[in-house]
Swiss-Prot record:
Gene3D superfamilies: Anticodon-binding domain, Bira Bifunctional Protein, Domain 2, YbaK/aminoacyl-tRNA synthetase-associated domain. HAMAP family: Pro_tRNA_synth_type1 (MF_01569). Pfam families: HGTP_anticodon, tRNA-synt_2b, tRNA_edit. Homodimer. This is Proline--tRNA ligase.
Length: 578
C-alpha cells in the first residue's frame, strides 16, 4: 500500500476527551473516529488490525472444532422472556418496538438466539456435541461509555456456544475453548493470565476471564506467588483463619457508650481510641426484598458479589434508610448485630475469632464495647464475604497473594442448563429418554483486544505493534521522493518484499523525513526501512526495529532476506504465554 493513497488521518495533539493511552493512540494514529458516545468507526489502519485479530480467532476456533455461524443482532423479546432475562438484564438492554408493536432488543449477547436455533434442529444424542461461534456486533447501552473501544456501547465480539449431552462432555468442550483462548491471545502477542471469575448476568456454575496485564486496566486480579491460583478481585477467595475457642473468662462486660455523631469507622476509632481491627461493621442489605445483615471487620470491605452468590439472590443492594430503621431501630451508621430479629446475620471469616469488639448499638449516637459472638448474639453463618487484600493468604495453598491490574479480553463460562432448561433445549439419549443439553459460552471482545494490545505495547512516540496483528509488517521510508535514486530503490524494495508476501507500506508522500519518522513511530509498524542518500551511496539502507529501537545498516541486495527473516522470527515470538 502507498501512504499517499491511504486514508490515514494522523494527529499530533492528544485528544482532550481520551482518558487512556489506547484511546489516545487509536485516535492519533487514524485507526478510529467517534460517531457518538461509545460508538466508533474503524478506519482502514484500525480495520486491518481488527481483521487480523479476527483471523487468528477464526483459525483457532476452527482448529478446536467450532463452526462459524452468523446470528441476527435484532432479537425478539419473547426469547428473552423465556430465559427470564428480559426483566433482569436492566437498562443496558436496548429495547424497541417495530411498526407492528412487537418488542425487540439489540443483542448484547446471543445465548437466547443460539439456544432457540439449536432446540429446533438438534433432536438426538447422535447430533451432539456441537460448538457454534460467530464474530458479530453487539450493543449494550452503557450508562457511561469510556476509554474508546475498550468500553463502548457498540462493539465487536466473538461469541461461541457449546452444546453437550452430559457434564463430562461439557467439561471437555470448556477445556478445548480454554486452550484455544490461550493460543489466541498468545498469537496476538499479549501477556495475559486466565483467572477465576464471577459469571455475572450471563450466569452459569463457573467461569474464567482472560486478563491482559496492564497498569491501566479497569479490573483487579489476584494471584498466588506459590501455586497456580488466580482470580479477578470480585471472585478472589481468601484462606479463613483457624477457629479458636474463647473462654468466658476472656469476655469483658458488655458496655454501652455514648458516641454522638460518630457514624463512620474513622469517627468511631477517634472517639473511642480503638483501631479499625477492633470494630465490627454491620451493613444491612436488601436481597430480593429481604433484609440481610452482613458483618465484617472494620478494616475490611464487603464484597457484594460474594454476598449475592452466597445468598443466591437475583438482586442485592445496600438497604435504604427505611429498611435500616425497621431492622435495627436506628438510623444509618449505628447498626449492630445484637437484637436484630428481622434479618439473617452473616459474618465474614475475618470475624471468626472476634473478642470484645466494638459494634453499633442499634441506637442513635450509641455503640457497644466488649461485644462477643455467642454470648451476645448468634450468627447464622460464617463465609468468605470480603474483598481480598495483600495481607490475605491463598485459599489453595496459604501462600502470599499478589495483586495486579488487568483488562478483560475474553471470558469462558460453564452455563450448565441455565438456558437450555428454561428454553426447552432437549435431546433423546441412547435409551430414548429426553435430556436437557449442557451448555457453555465463550466470548472475546475483538476491538477490546486491539485496545488492550496498545495498552501493553506503546511508548512515548506511539504504538509498538506485535508482528502478528500489526497493520503492516514493514514501512519503507525514502527521505526524499524527489530524489530519483532514493525513490527507485524504495519502489524496488516495496515491489520485491510485497512479491514475497510481506505486508508493506511505502511512505511515498512529499513530506519532510522527520514527519515521516514520527508517523511511522506513531502507527507502530514493526520494521522501518529508511532509504537515505548517505547510506545509499554506500549501497546500504537503514533497518530499524520499532520494539527495541535497534538499527542496522544493511546492503540493499541482502536487505530483503534479512527483513523476511525478522518477520518470521517475530511471528513465532508471539507463542510465548505469560
Amino acid at each position: 500500500m502507498r501512504y499517499s493513497e491511504m486514508f490515514l488521518p494522523t494527529e499530533r495533539e492528544i485528544p482532550s476527551d481520551a482518558e487512556v493511552v489506547s484511546h489516545q493512540l487509536m485516535l492519533r494514529a487514524g485507526m478510529i473516529r467517534k460517531l457518538s458516545a461509545g460508538i466508533y468507526s474503524y478506519l482502514p489502519l484500525g480495520y486491518r488490525v481488527l481483521r487480523k485479530v479476527e483471523q487468528i480467532i477464526r483459525e483457532e476456533m476452527n482448529r478446536a472444532g467450532a463452526q462459524e455461524v452468523y446470528l441476527p443482532m435484532v432479537q425478539p423479546a419473547e426469547l428473552w422472556q423465556e430465559s427470564g432475562r428480559w426483566e433482569h438484564y436492566g437498562k443496558e438492554l436496548l429495547r424497541f418496538r417495530d411498526r407492528h408493536d412487537r418488542e425487540y432488543c439489540l443483542g448484547p449477547t446471543h445465548e437466547e438466539v443460539i439456544t432457540d436455533l439449536v432446540r429446533h434442529e438438534i433432536k438426538t444424542y447422535r447430533q451432539l456435541p456441537k460448538n457454534l461461534y460467530q464474530i458479530q456486533t453487539k450493543f449494550r447501552d452503557e450508562i457511561r461509555p469510556r476509554f474508546g473501544v475498550m468500553r463502548g456501547r457498540e462493539f465487536g465480539m466473538k461469541d461461541a456456544y457449546s452444546f453437550d449431552a452430559d457434564e463430562e462432555g461439557a467439561e471437555i468442550s470448556y477445556q478445548k475453548m480454554f486452550e484455544a483462548y490461550k493460543r489466541i491471545f498468545a498469537r496476538c502477542g499479549l501477556r495475559f493470565r486466565p483467572v477465576e471469575a464471577d459469571s455475572g448476568t450471563i450466569g452459569g456454575s463457573f467461569s474464567h476471564e482472560f486478563m491482559v496485564m496492564a497498569d491501566s486496566g479497569e479490573d483487579g486480579l489476584v494471584f498466588c506467588a506459590t501455586c497456580s491460583y488466580a482470580a479477578n478481585l470480585e471472585k478472589a477467595e481468601v484462606h479463613p483463619p483457624e477457629k479458636m475457642e474463647i473462654s468466658n473468662d476472656e469476655m469483658l462486660l458488655l458496655t454501652e457508650v455514648h458516641t454522638p455523631n460518630a457514624r463512620t469507622i474513622d469517627e468511631v476509632c477517634a472517639f473511642l481510641n480503638v483501631t479499625p481491627q477492633e470494630i465490627v461493621k454491620t451493613l444491612i442489605f436488601n436481597a430480593d426484598g429481604n433484609p440481610v445483615a452482613v458483618l465484617v471487620r472494620g478494616d475490611e470491605e464487603v464484597n457484594e458479589i460474594k454476598v449475592k452468590n452466597y445468598l443466591k439472590c437475583q438482586e442485592l443492594e445496600l438497604a435504604m434508610d427505611d429498611m435500616i430503621q425497621d431492622v435495627t431501630g436506628a438510623p444509618r451508621g449505628f447498626a449492630g448485630a445484637i437484637g436484630i430479629k428481622k434479618a439473617r446475620i452473616l459474618a465474614d471469616y475475618s470475624l471468626l475469632n472476634m473478642k470484645n469488639v466494638v459494634m453499633g448499638a442499634n441506637k442513635e449516637d450509641y455503640h457497644l464495647r466488649n461485644v462477643n459472638e455467642g454470648r451476645d448474639f448468634q450468627i447464622s453463618a460464617f463465609a468468605d464475604l470480603k474483598v481480598a487484600r495483600e495481607t490475605d493468604s491463598c485459599p489453595r495453598c496459604q501462600g502470599a497473594l499478589k495483586f495486579a491490574r488487568g483488562i478483560e479480553v475474553g471470558h469462558v463460562f460453564k452455563l450448565g442448563t441455565k438456558y437450555s432448561k428454561a428454553m426447552g433445549a432437549s435431546y433423546l439419549d441412547k435409551n430414548g429418554k429426553e435430556q436437557i443439553m449442557i451448555m457453555g459460552c465463550y466470548g472475546i471482545g475483538t476491538g477490546r483486544t486491539v485496545a488492550a494490545c496498545i495498552e501493553q505495547n506503546h511508548d512515548e512516540n506511539g504504538i509498538v505493534w506485535p508482528m502478528p496483528i500489526s497493520p503492516y509488517q514493514v514501512i519503507i521510508t525514502p527521505v526524499n521522493m524527489n530524489d530519483k535514486a532514493l525513490a527507485e530503490t524504495a519502489e524496488r524494495l516495496y515491489e520485491s518484499l510485497a512479491g514475497k508476501g510481506a505486508e508493506v507500506l511505502l511512505d511515498d508522500r512529499d513530506e519532510r523525513a522527520g514527519v515521516k519518522f514520527k508517523d511511522a513511530d506513531l502507527i507502530g509498524i514493526p520494521i522501518r526501512v529508511t532509504v537515505g542518500p548517505k547510506k545509499l551511496a554506500e549501497g546500504k539502507v537503514e533497518v530499524r526495529l520499532r520494539d527495541t529501537g535497534e538499527t542496522s545498516d544493511v546492503q540493499v541486495d541482502s536487505v530483503e532476506k534479512m527483513i523476511l527473516r525478522v518477520i518470521e522470527g517475530k511471528m513465532s515470538e508471539s507463542y510465548l504465554i505469560f
